[in-house]
């Protein structure tokens, strides 16, 4: 609605009204809560990614725990250091729970979040199913590949490896009819 007001005021040449409408829109957006979850398999670096987004480092008291073995046992929220309305959610990784993926999705209340899919080493069927769930909910998702330094340390050309990772992710998504182009 605000966009139409801005467009109309702009077409009418009413600059003060354009500015007023833009300011009002910014106020609304800055107060709108945004819940983002890092979703993926255990050990993919979701907690570390949250710390990086918050610029807190992984050893700070306010940081999610990071350990070699299943550090995240239950849902935890962390506020963004840059945007007060953004909450980053650290959930137990898929594969860490003893329940089915369907039960996991219900227990973790996936309908509450926007998604960042976190993967490393391989793009698993759990990632594909999480992406399918997000798409079925009408939500967009992003895929972040972590621990890339380890993947690129094999000596092959980085550009080739990055392209292979991208193609593998797209191929797996398209097999399950997720994000068809």
From Swiss-Prot:
SUPFAM superfamilies: P-loop containing nucleoside triphosphate hydrolases (SSF52540). GTP binds at residues 41-48, 66-70, 147-149. The G5 motif of the IRG-type G domain is missing because the IRGM protein is truncated in anthropoids. Its EC number is 3.6.5.-. It holds the Pfam family IIGP. Widely expressed (at protein level). Expressed in several tissues including colon, small bowel and peripheral blood leukocytes. It is an enzyme of class 3 (hydrolase). Immunity-related GTPase that plays important roles in innate immunity and inflammatory response. Acts as a dynamin-like protein that binds to intracellular membranes and promotes remodeling and trafficking of those membranes. Required for clearance of acute protozoan and bacterial infections by interacting with autophagy and lysosome regulatory proteins, thereby promoting the fusion of phagosomes with lysosomes for efficient degradation of cargo including microbes. Regulates selective autophagy, including xenophagy and mitophagy, both directly and indirectly. This is Immunity-related GTPase family M protein. Interacts with ULK1; promoting the coassembly of ULK1 and BECN1. Interacts with BECN1; enhancing BECN1-interacting partners and influencing the composition of the BECN1 complex. Interacts with ATG16L1. Interacts with NOD2; promoting IRGM 'Lys-63'-linked polyubiquitination, which is required for interactions with the core autophagy factors. Interacts with STX17; promoting STX17 recruitment to autophagosomes. Interacts with ATG8 proteins (GABARAP, GABARAPL1, GABARAPL2, MAP1LC3A, MAP1LC3B and MAP1LC3C); promoting STX17 recruitment to autophagosomes. GO terms for cellular component: autophagosome membrane; cell projection; cytosol; endoplasmic reticulum membrane; Golgi apparatus; Golgi membrane; late endosome membrane; lysosomal membrane. It is linked to Inflammatory bowel disease 19: A chronic, relapsing inflammation of the gastrointestinal tract with a complex etiology. It is subdivided into Crohn disease and ulcerative colitis phenotypes. Crohn disease may affect any part of the gastrointestinal tract from the mouth to the anus, but most frequently it involves the terminal ileum and colon. Bowel inflammation is transmural and discontinuous; it may contain granulomas or be associated with intestinal or perianal fistulas. Belongs to the TRAFAC class dynamin-like GTPase superfamily. IRG family. It catalyses: GTP + H2O = GDP + phosphate + H(+).
